[in-house]
């Protein structure tokens, strides 16, 4: 049956223009190579012109260094391996993916999502689908690839439009990087880059992976409520008619077998044991490696925060092992090793990208361009009198627009953080608040950007159920979510700054530079 909706002509022209622009952009690796070349040229020019600034914390004069100087060229070659392996997000990602690979390829993620979805009443199916999409982001791309088509199948089995299920699942997954119930891998990664930027100004600044948790909860509940209303009132009535196409033998895959249910029970038992062990390592008298009783208030949980990556690795590994052993996907230790290797395989493009991204970040630091640009930029903004309540919505909007040009959240933040984070620190805004504003903007255009691989995959998944569905139809369905989430994100961000609400455990909006 032909589609009952037609793409808006203006939106269609805009999308085609973005596609043409996106097709002309080089690969993200090439973008970083170009940026490194530009950085070298600017450093040479800045050193020749004598650009400098006084460091607001130490009082020392910072001068731009030419990246072609004998000292820095020697450093570039001698420290290349250390630059790559020492890049903060790299080790975090590798460790977590080793554990997540076992949980994914052992079947735990798929079974857990199916168990959760089949217990949901039809009346709250939409908000729960969005919520589970948010949680699926913690399994990285693997969770999204499993969950989005699975949501379509589960909606079809309940008599609802399968495309609606997949759109809602994708909406949750695409925005789950900022709005979520619990922090996860992305929080560790994004704050690793934030730490790199903050340490250009204050070398002792350390990240808190839970630094946006309360803010994330507010965004999550806002997006779930708005998504529920938009999905039910605007999107579902306008979707192309579905006549049962695509619902075949796969319908049974929504059911859990007896072995899968047994596996989930064992994984749940392991989860409880891990939680108990973690609490014990924080509260055992005389032996609490995850809690520093001698530290001042607000810093006592720092050992726990610093151990989150290791704890998440153990969580994924042991629950995945327990589940896989119960269902038969894991019969020996070699199976676990093989699953870890499979988990790492999709990271190969990321490992290549990080090689160039790490060099861009460290060379930015060597040149002193980052702190000098931040110091001078902060001074100019202070003279103009721009209020923080306006600065962060501007950053949010810029982040959203940049997503049409560079799809990777990590790539954009790697380029922006060395300037934006220290600049706003000098204006009294914490790195955690700056990170939160960036994250809100970054996730919005994931819903409608053809440069985002997830958006393209969503269209392919939808065409299984509606073969004639086109890009413009999907854009028309996703656009109301993006607009509503953008407006809500602006309001929440501005309100958070104005009221100076806590962002997470031990973090807030204001920031004061250390005394000299």
Task: State where each predicted segment sits.
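Membrane-core helix-loop-helix motifs of multi-pass transport proteins
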Residues: 19, 23, 148, 152-243, ...
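Intrinsically disordered, low-complexity non-transmembrane regions of multi-pass membrane transporters
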Residues: 1-24, 53-68, 236-263, 509-516
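Interfacial loop/helix-cap signal at membrane boundaries in integral membrane proteins
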Residues: 9, 13-14, 52-90, 200-208, ...
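Hydrophobic core segments of alpha-helical transmembrane domains in multi-pass membrane transport
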Residues: 32-47, 93-101, 132-136, 172-176, ...
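Hydrophobic alpha-helical transmembrane segments of multi-pass integral membrane proteins
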Residues: 93-94, 121-152, 157, 351-358, ...
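Core transmembrane alpha-helical segments of multi-pass membrane transporters/permeases
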Residues: 28-33, 37, 41, 62-110, ...
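Membrane-interfacial loop-to-helix junctions in multi-pass transporters
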Residues: 72, 82-90, 117-128, 162-164, ...
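Interfacial/capping segments of alpha-helical transmembrane domains
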Residues: 44-71, 186-190, 286-296, 367-376, ...
């Amino acid at each position: 049956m032909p589609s009952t909706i037609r793409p808006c002509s203006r939106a269609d022209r805009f999308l085609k223009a973005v596609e043409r622009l996106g097709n002309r952009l080089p690969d993200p690796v090439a973008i970083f190579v170009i940026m490194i070349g530009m950085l070298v040229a600017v450093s040479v020019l800045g050193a020749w012109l004598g650009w400098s600034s006084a460091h607001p914390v130490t009082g020392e004069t910072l001068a731009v260094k030419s990246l072609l100087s004998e000292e820095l060229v020697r450093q570039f070659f001698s420290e290349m391996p250390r630059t790559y392996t020492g890049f903060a997000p790299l080790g975090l990602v590798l460790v977590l993916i080793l554990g997540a690979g076992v949980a994914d390829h052992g079947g735990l993620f798929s079974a857990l999502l199916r168990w959760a979805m089949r217990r949901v009443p039809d009346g709250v199916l939409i908000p729960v689908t969005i919520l589970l999409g948010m949680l699926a982001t913690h399994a990285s791309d693997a969770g999204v690839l499993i969950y989005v088509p699975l949501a379509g199948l589960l909606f079809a089995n309940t008599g609802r439009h399968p495309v609606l299920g997949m759109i809602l699942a994708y909406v949750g997954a695409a925005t789950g990087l900022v709005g979520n119930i619990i922090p996860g891998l992305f929080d560790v990664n994004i704050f690793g880059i934030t730490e790199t930027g903050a340490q250009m100004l204050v070398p002792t600044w350390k990240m808190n992976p839970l630094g946006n948790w309360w803010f994330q909860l507010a965004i999550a509940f806002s997006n779930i409520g708005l998504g529920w209303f938009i999905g039910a009132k605007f999107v579902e009535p306008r979707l192309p008619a579905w006549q049962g196409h695509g619902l075949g033998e796969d319908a049974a895959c929504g059911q859990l077998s007896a072995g899968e249910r047994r596996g989930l029970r064992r994984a749940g038992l392991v989860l409880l044991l891990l939680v108990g062990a973690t609490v014990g390592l924080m509260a055992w008298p005389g032996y609490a490696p995850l809690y520093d009783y001698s530290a001042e208030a607000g810093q006592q949980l720092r050992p726990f925060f610093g151990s989150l990556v290791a704890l998440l690795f153990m969580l994924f590994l042991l629950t995945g092992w327990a589940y896989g052993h119960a269902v038969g996907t894991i019969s020996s230790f070699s199976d676990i090793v093989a699953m870890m290797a499979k988990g790492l395989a999709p990271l190969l493009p990321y490992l290549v990208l990080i090689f160039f991204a790490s060099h861009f970040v460290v060379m930015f630091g060597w040149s002193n361009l980052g702190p000098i640009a931040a110091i001078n930029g902060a001074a100019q903004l202070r003279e103009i009198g721009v209020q923080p309540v306006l600065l962060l919505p501007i950053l949010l909007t810029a982040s959203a627009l940049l997503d049409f040009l560079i799809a990777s959240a990590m790539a954009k933040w790697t380029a922006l953080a060395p300037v934006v984070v220290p600049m706003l620190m000098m204006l009294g805004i914490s790195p955690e608040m700056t990170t939160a504003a960036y994250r809100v903007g970054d996730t919005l255009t994931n819903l409608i950007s053809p440069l985002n691989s997830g958006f393209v995959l969503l269209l392919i998944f939808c065409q299984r159920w509606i073969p004639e569905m086109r890009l413009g139809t999907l854009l028309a369905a996703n656009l109301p979510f993006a607009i509503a989430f953008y407006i809500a994100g602006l309001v929440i961000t501005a309100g958070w700054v104005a009221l100076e609400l806590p962002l997470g455990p031990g973090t807030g909006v204001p920031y004061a530079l250390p005394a000299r």
